[in-house]
Amino acid sequence: MAKDEFSDKKKPYWSKDEAVANIQRYCAFQERCHKEVRYKLIEHAIYGDLLEEIISDLISNNFLDEEIFARTFARGKFRMKQWGRNKIKQELKIRDVSAYSIKAAMTEIDGGEYLSVLSNLLAKKERTTTFKNQLDKKKKLTDYALSKGYEYDLIAEMIGKR
């Protein structure tokens, strides 16, 4: 079968009751942002007032909570993927999370643990990478930490201590 045969398949339409049940299950499985839920409903031909009504019901029944999503997302990305604050903020903004929820999510990252993780990332990268000279080393370590979303001033301070 060709890959394109699957891309033309349409998602089945949901009735209101099916949409509510399926989206509640979708939200109960893991925390979701409003954008993901909205996209899922639109995928199944739920639009306009019905879409807004379903989202409103999800919020009032605690199936959808933007702040809890943001906090969970930040904790998970920091602990599992060792992302820095900048990358986490950027991803939350892409998902249309409010500034208030992003600020709340940043409180989930302990300052001491944050510095420790950055230090460990730099040490591991230093062990596994070859460098031509000190300038090359500084550039590669800085680029790596920036790509993980860490702040430049913290990176420069850590590299300066090495």
Predicted regions, residues:
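An alpha-helical, amphipathic repeat domain used for nucleic-acid recognition
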Residues: 1-162
